[in-house]
């Protein structure tokens, strides 16, 4: 918006701190990257300094392997992506209010011509206006754990194992030169069969 109208008055509210993030890496397809490049060349170039690229998706099912080529993807650290966006906001003189919830929708509508909300899956705005938006929530019962590792994969990897408890799977991908994202997922019944529910009460800080 600032590129189109440098005089536009824009304010950003961010409920988290500048370095807060949830998860480790974020993936972009070639198509998505083309859209980012067309929208903001500067952001695209800044992101590209941190990218890990790959073209293959490798699938391992109980030790049987096959690769699917022709997939263009890139990934980067979620924290570094936040830094890129924060730098761009600063370049354009856009104030970002960290650790601050946005004002109520009624107040925003009274003072701004355009409101863009990005609140995630538990969006209060989407819930408040679900009849207007026509949105519904359909909860599922899979369990997953989002981890990071210093093992650097060469491609996007799927690992699927039929265990005595049921099917468990992992998808993992490099996010920079030194680390990868590693996500473990399974049905809730499998999770309970394996005894993971016994650790429900334990809480670890992000990154530990």
Task: Please identify what each model-predicted range represents.
Residues 143-155, 164:
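Glycine-rich loop(s) and the adjacent beta-strand/alpha-helix scaffold that form part
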Residues 2-24:
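Glycine-rich FAD pyrophosphate-binding loop
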Residues 71, 77, 155-208:
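Conserved FAD/dinucleotide-binding core of flavoprotein oxidoreductases
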Residues 1, 59, 105, 172-173:
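A structural signal for short hydrophobic beta-strand segments in well-ordered beta-sheet cores
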Residues 15-17, 25, 31, 47-51:
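Glycine-rich active-site loop/strand segments that organize a redox cofactor
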Residues 25-28, 42, 129-133, 149-151, ...:
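Short, glycine/charged-enriched secondary-structure capping and boundary segments
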Residues 6, 90, 152, 175-178:
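Short strand-connecting beta-turns/loops that link adjacent beta-strands
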Residues 33-146:
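Conserved N-terminal helical subregion
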